[in-house]
């Protein structure tokens, strides 16, 4: 929806902020390190535009795609710590074809298990007083058996659990 969609999104974010709601923006962002850093600043941090510091997208949390590895995720983790924000990394998604890639085996482990190990590692540096960290995982409700395995791998990560209702 282009600029019109952006405007509506920002109005919705402003309204949610006024109501004191926690805002998760489902953007599934990531790229190579330098571009990931720019995405992270735009969604979680602050940017300088002609000497004026602003927060372009005042949300609490975004979803990210972990499949570019640590150099693509680290800028988001850094900004989580700096700006008291959070991320949810795609681990085992709820869509029917998720298994085409996420269920593939690497040795004796599924790719989603390997990704969960990365999420657990990235989360370690953000663990707060609650015992949980700022790096959570998207784990589909459509795969409850896998979710049990993933909880054991990521005991200190929040789970964002999509998959109830229409997919």
Name each model-derived stretch:
Residues 9, 70-73, 144-148:
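Short, well-ordered alpha-helical microsegments
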Residues 23-27, 61-64, 89, 139, ...:
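General beta-strand structural signal in soluble alpha/beta enzymes
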Residues 1, 66, 141:
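Residues that line or immediately flank small-molecule/substrate-binding pockets and catalytic motifs
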Residues 1-55, 146:
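N-terminal active-site wall of soluble small-molecule enzyme domains
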Residues 141-167:
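A C-terminal functional module that forms or caps the active site or interfaces directly
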Residues 31-136:
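Conserved anion-binding
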Residues 13-17, 77-81, 120-124, 148-154:
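Surface-exposed amphipathic alpha-helices with a cationic face
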Residues 19-20, 124-126, 130, 156-160:
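Structural alpha-beta junctions
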């Amino acid at each position: 929806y282009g600029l019109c969609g952006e405007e509506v999104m920002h109005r919705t974010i402003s309204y949610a902020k006024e109501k004191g709601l926690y805002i998760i923006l489902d953007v599934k962002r990531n790229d190579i390190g330098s571009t990931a850093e720019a995405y992270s600043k735009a969604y979680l941090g602050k940017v300088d535009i002609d000497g004026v510091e602003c927060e372009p997208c005042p949300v609490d949390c975004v979803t990210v795609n972990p499949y570019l590895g640590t150099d693509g995720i680290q800028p988001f983790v850094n900004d989580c710590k700096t700006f008291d924000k959070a991320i949810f990394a795609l681990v085992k998604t709820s869509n029917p074809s998720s298994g085409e890639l996420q269920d593939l085996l690497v040795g004796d482990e599924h790719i989603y298990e390997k990704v969960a190990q990365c999420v657990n590692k990235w989360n370690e540096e953000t663990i707060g007083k609650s015992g949980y960290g700022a790096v959570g995982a998207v784990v589909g409700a459509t795969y409850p058996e896998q979710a049990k395995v993933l909880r054991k791998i990521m005991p200190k990560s929040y789970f964002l659990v999509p998959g109830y209702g229409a997919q």
